[in-house]
Every structure is written in structure tokens, then in C-alpha cells.
């Protein structure tokens, strides 16, 4: 409890003292004409009270205000530590999540957003958060001490992350209404050119992927999880709001899963802000 109280901003405490002091002042201001000695508290809503009763009521009320403010402030401090905000879209991502199909919790490594250009106007479509199993970081010691710029330009680091035999996931949160077919067409437009000679396995995987979004409205707040279980298998989960709890489909194609990873972390990522954020976090972590 002491730690929680210590975390309450001083401005809140000052505000609390001022609020209770104002109750004292209010007692000398709010009274009935001709009966200046019979003061009535501004807290009173219908019944007269004595000055003694009024004092007790005021003290109890101030105590209740104190408890509520402390509880609220402590809760806000705790909640703020549990989330990271993607500032361009104001979407908040949990720092640690347990996702469907994953064997252990994943940790947030970076956030960004996807912007689509219409003529010269950029329209934000979704925010994205990238999560990894923390065991992946132990395999990146070769990049210890590198700057964020060096990490971002080094494609071999991101290849190492993709090839690591541990789960990683991309959480996409729509910030505007999008038709499912439109979303898939944009994704397929980025994936297909990265697969030079699609095999029957690739074609089947792309068909499965497409089927998830056909005739499916993706309203603002919808969440899509793209979870790489390994280099050849990826889970896709969709919900209309909040983290999905079930797996909608499994994509079984190494070419498709690697192409999708390259869409976000290759040399020409669809969300430069996401890749930059991940690089910055890695630079701070790999020290």
C-alpha cells in the first residue's frame, strides 16, 4: 500500500487538499437568508443538518474522496505500466499477452501503423504491435551494441528472428472500417509478388488465407492476429474487438509465412514505423 501511495502524483494530493479546504469555505458562503449562523453544507441535498453533523458529514465525505482518488490514481499508474500506446493512432497494446495456439506468453517488441495513400492524402488503416517469445532475444547476441539504424538496415537480424524456433505474433487493430475483401486484396498484393513460383501448397495456403476475410466486415476496433508458430506454420485469428480467443485458420506454407514476414520486416516494409520501433527496442535490449 505504501508503494501505491508513493506512486500517486503530487498534483492529485494538492487537488484533494484544495477540494476539502473549499468545503470549509463553502460552509460560510452557502446559508439561508436571515439565518447566517445556521450554515448548511453544499453536500446537503435536501435535509437540514446541525453544524456538528455537517462537520462529521464533511469529514467523512473528504475521507471518501481521498480513498477514491488514491484508488483511481494507483489503478491508472498500474494500467499505464501494462500497456504501450501507438501514438499516431492512440491504440494501446498490452506489453505481455497469451495468444491462442501459443505455449507461453509473448512480449511486445514494437508498435507502428499502416497508412494507405489516396492521391496525396495518407489515411491510417490500422495499428500494429509485434510480439515475440523472449527466448528469441537470447539468440541475437551477435547484434549486441548495435544502434537502432544499424539493426534496421541489417536484414540478417530479422531473418534470424523469423527462423527462431519460437512463437512470434503480429497484432493488427483496425482504426477505420474496412471490408474484409479489401483488406485481403491489399495483403495479397504485398504477399504474392514475394512468391516467385507458387507451389500447389502455396496456392492452397493463399486460398485458405483469403477465405478468412471474404464476406467479413472488419469494423473499427477489429483485431487480427498473425502468429508464426514456426517457419512453415502460421495461425490466423480474428475478432470484432479485443484479443481473439480462437484460431480461425492455420496457414501451412513456408513460402507464404516467410513472404508475410517480409511484408512487415523486409527491406520495403508496409509499416516503416513498426520496423523502426522494433529496431529501437532491440537496440535498447541488446546491450
Curated annotation (Swiss-Prot):
Transit peptide, from-to: 1-72
Keyword annotations of the record: Acetylation, Chloroplast, Plastid, Transit peptide
Keyword DNA damage: no
One GO BP: fatty acid metabolic process
Keyword check for Transit peptide: yes
InterPro entries recorded: Chalcone_isomerase (IPR016087), Chalcone_isomerase_3-sand (IPR016088), Chalcone_isomerase_bundle_sf (IPR016089), Chalcone_isomerase_sf (IPR036298)
N-acetylalanine: residues carrying this PTM: 73
Reported consequences of knocking out the gene: Embryo lethal.
GO CC annotations, alphabetized: chloroplast; chloroplast stroma
Cellular compartments annotated: Plastid, Chloroplast stroma
GO molecular function, a single term: fatty acid binding
Binding site for hexadecanoate: 114, 126
Tissue: Expressed in developing cotyledons, young seedlings, roots, seeds, embryos, macrospores, preanthesis and tapetum. Restricted to developing and reproductive tissues.
Function, as annotated: Fatty-acid-binding protein. Interacts with most fatty acids tested and has maximal relative affinity for C16:0.
Family label: Belongs to the chalcone isomerase family.
Name of the protein: Fatty-acid-binding protein 3, chloroplastic
Protein species of origin: Arabidopsis thaliana
Amino acid at each position: 500500500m505504501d508503494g501505491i501511495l508513493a506512486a500517486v502524483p503530487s498534483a492529485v494530493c494538492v487537488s484533494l487538499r484544495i477540494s476539502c479546504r473549499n468545503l470549509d469555505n463553502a460552509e460560510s458562503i452557502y446559508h439561508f437568508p436571515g439565518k447566517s449562523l445556521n450554515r448548511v453544507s453544499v453536500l446537503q441535498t435536501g435535509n437540514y443538518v446541525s453544524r456538528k453533523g455537517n462537520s462529521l458529514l464533511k469529514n467523512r465525505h473528504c475521507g471518501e474522496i481521498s480513498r477514491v482518488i488514491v484508488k483511481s490514481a494507483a489503478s491508472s499508474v498500474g494500467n499505464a505500466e501494462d500497456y504501450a500506446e501507438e501514438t499516431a493512432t492512440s491504440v494501446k497494446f498490452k506489453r505481455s499477452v497469451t495468444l491462442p495456439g501459443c505455449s507461453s506468453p509473448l512480449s511486445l517488441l514494437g508498435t507502428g501503423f499502416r497508412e494507405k495513400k489516396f492521391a496525396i492524402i495518407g489515411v491510417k488503416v490500422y495499428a500494429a504491435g509485434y510480439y515475440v517469445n523472449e527466448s528469441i532475444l537470447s539468440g541475437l547476441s551477435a547484434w549486441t551494441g548495435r544502434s537502432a539504424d544499424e539493426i534496421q538496415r541489417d536484414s540478417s537480424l530479422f531473418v534470424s528472428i523469423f527462423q527462431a524456433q519460437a512463437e512470434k505474433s503480429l497484432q493488427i487493430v483496425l482504426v477505420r472500417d474496412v471490408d474484409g475483401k479489401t483488406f485481403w486484396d491489399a495483403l495479397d498484393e504485398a504477399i504474392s509478388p514475394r512468391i516467385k513460383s507458387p507451389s500447389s501448397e502455396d496456392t492452397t495456403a493463399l486460398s485458405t488465407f483469403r477465405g478468412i476475410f471474404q464476406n467479413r466486415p472488419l469494423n473499427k476496433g477489429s483485431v487480427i492476429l498473425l502468429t508464426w508458430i514456426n517457419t512453415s506454420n502460421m495461425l490466423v485469428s480474428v475478432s470484432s474487438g479485443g484479443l481473439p480467443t480462437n484460431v480461425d485458420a492455420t496457414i501451412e506454407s513456408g513460402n507464404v509465412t516467410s513472404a508475410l514476414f517480409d511484408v512487415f520486416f523486409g527491406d520495403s516494409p508496409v509499416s516503416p514505423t513498426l520496423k523502426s520501433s522494433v529496431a529501437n527496442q532491440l537496440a535498447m535490449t541488446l546491450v
